[in-house]
Amino acid sequence: MPKTLAEKILSRVAARDAKAGDLVIAPVSRVMVHDSVIDAVMAGLRDLGKEKVWDTTKVAVFVDHAAPAPTPVVADSHRVLREWVRAQGIATFYDAGEGVCHQIMVEEGYCEPGTVIVGSDSHSNSYGAVGAFGAGMGATDIAVALALGRTWLRVPESIKVTFTGRPRKGVTMKDAIMRVVREIGTDGARYACVEFHGAGSLPQGDRITLAGMTTEMGAKAGIVVATPEAPDWLFPDRGAAYANEVTVDLSTLEPQIAVPPRVDQVIDISEAIGQPVDVVFLGSCTNGRLVDMRQAATVLRGRRISPEVRLEVVPSSRRQFEDAMADGTLLALSTAGAVIGSSGCGPCLGRTGGVLAGQEICLSTANRNYRGRMGSADASIFIGSPYVAAVAALTGVIDDPRPYLEASEAEFDDLVERRRSERAGRGAASVRSGDRSRELMVAAARIGVAAEIDD
């Protein structure tokens, strides 16, 4: 019987012929744990009567979600975590400032293609960027995996996503995956494995963006087919059965915007032009890499951000941070007015550094925009690419980055001045009123996305 990638991987690791719907006991090649759930994980191990993890060489621990510690309570939790890591003898430990767990897991080679990796974070799907079956799990399941070195899984059905064509300048794979989320919806891949075809030759960072955002469709895993790291056997069989198939033509795609408060409320940027923003966040496991910062610097180098906007830049790992320092990218962003944060999750989940106030409007390159994600439940979060983020920081409004990337110096300055003037003409009361955000929610509803609009 022809197999999908998920069926192949789980059959191989479980040493049995497995198909979608079967239950398997799967050995794990690595377990990832981070600071947000470590207390519950340690409690789970105690409940299991286990003092030691099954293999200290196959456990990776990170302090990234609330780092550096924002409160004494969190600082105490981090202290306990460090003591536990030392007592266990776990060598693979990344403390505050080293970066986001998912970026480091892939970047440092901890993810082996064709293996099962479980993590205490929903975006552990990111490990599919190199052909691994990465899955996020709760604290109890992670404790069991740490104790036994294996986990149970139901083999998921698979959804095939195929990319064709080449994206135009100013269009990124963040736009591509947002379009996929729009097509599938936040529940359309529930407990499925999303297979990406036509993306294997992409840079590793783009593949992390694709695999990681499958979480936003409800997926159990997301795997890029035919990556450079993949062994010869790691390909889906011809004739494998898929629950759904989606094709995205990159050559006709324009930049995409996710409208709050749902990540699948995605519209073309042409429908969002002029939406004012107060804060721009460039970072996260989705888009905090050197290539993302370089894209932003392409727009911002030699210029200053709008006085109406705060720009927060958080590299996804120390390596990305140092590479961006070495080539002048971070200097360009800092000179433009950005606040540069230490490597980690930053304000993405609203637990440290740069949280949003009530009524503030943010353009984020992260992966989630539900109410309260980055701070106040009364704030609004739009999601876009690094190019879109940079233009928003510069002008104070959401705009299509493509004209800026093609413009002469004089044309560029004219575009910026025009957008800033338009925002100023609206007045502060208009910016805070949310009228434009409401219009965009209605626009999202028109394209068949269920918009949530509160009075």
Model-assigned labels for residue ranges:
Residues M1-D455:
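Fe-S-dependent hydro-lyases/dehydratases of central metabolism
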